[in-house]
Structure formats: C-alpha cells, structure tokens
Amino acid sequence: MDIKNIPEHELARLKEKAKELAGSSTEYQSEYSSLLTRRVNHEPLQYIEEYIPFYSISLKVDERCLIPRPETEFLIELIKDNIKSPNKILDVGTGSGCIALMMKSLFPESEVMGVDVSEDAIELAKENAKLNSLDVSFFESNLLDNVKEKGHDLIIANLPYIPTENLNELDREVIDYEPLSALNG
C-alpha cells in the first residue's frame, strides 16, 4: 500500500491517534509517521487505533483476535429481535468477547460464558469484560470440551469458516495480521 492510497478518513483517524500518543507537539510528527508506516504496511486500522466501537460497547482489539465484522453486529440484532431473556448463554469461539459481552449488555440478568481455544483470545476477552464492567465468565476450551455446565438456553458459535484453500485470497491486512486460527475453517 502506498500512502497515496490511504483514504482521507483513515488519515484523519491516524492524526487523532498520533495526537493522543504524542506527549508534546514535537513528538506528534514522529508518532504520526510511525502510524502511517504501520498502515502502509497493511496493519489494520483497528489494531493501530487499539479500540473500536462495537454495537453499544467499546472493544480492545489486537493480533490476539479477529476484528469483529459488521456481520457479527447483524447476528446480535437477530438475537435481540428474536430471543427473549435467556437464563444461560454460551458463546463458543468468543475471540474478543464481543458477542458474549453484548449478550450480557442486552440480557443483564443472564449468566453468560464465553469459550475459545486460544488462551490469548480469552485473555483479551477478559480485558474487554473489565473495560466494559460486564460480568461474563471466559475460559479456554476447544469447542465444548471444557464446558461442564449444561442447560444453556442460547448457544452462539461464530466459528472459523474460510476454507484453507481460500485463505490466500484474503486481503493482506487480514492474512498478515489477524490470527489464522480464527479464520481457517
């Protein structure tokens, strides 16, 4: 990617991030240059900014998880419009925790758990729970292997779905930065 190919709205966001990081006006140019270099090298803007809005919460995102997609917000909408007050919710393949955290936000009386095969993703999901002051249990599990509790009213699984042979067709910012284990299905 060339700097000329970075959209104007992304440049504006990078400038804001540089202002946030710079301790003084003399450090601003260095920070901005560093952020531009990262973006030119195809690092996702969401990773550079570190936090993204997701539905009604804020999420920290980095290389430990897949960046939540608009389709995930659509899934939240479907659940919100069609499910009435589940008691126990399980999110399988939780990643950043976005689905589990939104379930707790939408259904505050529900017991919500999120599991993921990645220890790093679980760590990030716990950070996001703390960031949003939401009481959700997260633990490591390959699918349902370590899930001892039964009787969930709602089980959500937004699992990897891209066939191995199609991975090379993904954009560089996806294939070079996001965890392949969250994509390869």
Roles of regions detected by a PLM:
Residues 159-185:
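Mobile active-site "lid"/loop adjacent to the S-adenosyl-L-methionine
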Residues 60, 102, 116, 175, ...:
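Conserved beta-strand segments that form the floor/walls of ligand-binding pockets within enzyme
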Residues 11, 32, 42-45, 96, ...:
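A general structural signal for well-ordered alpha-helical segments in protein cores
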Residues 1-11:
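Non-catalytic nucleic-acid substrate-recognition regions in nucleic-acid-modifying enzymes
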Residues 4, 66-69, 89:
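Short, solvent-exposed loop/helix junctions and linker helices
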Residues 21, 38-42, 132, 162, ...:
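Phosphate/oxyanion-binding loops and surfaces in catalytic or ligand/nucleic-acid-binding neighborhoods
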Residues 74-169:
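Conserved SAM/SAH cofactor-binding pocket of Class I
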Residues 13-80:
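Conserved AdoMet
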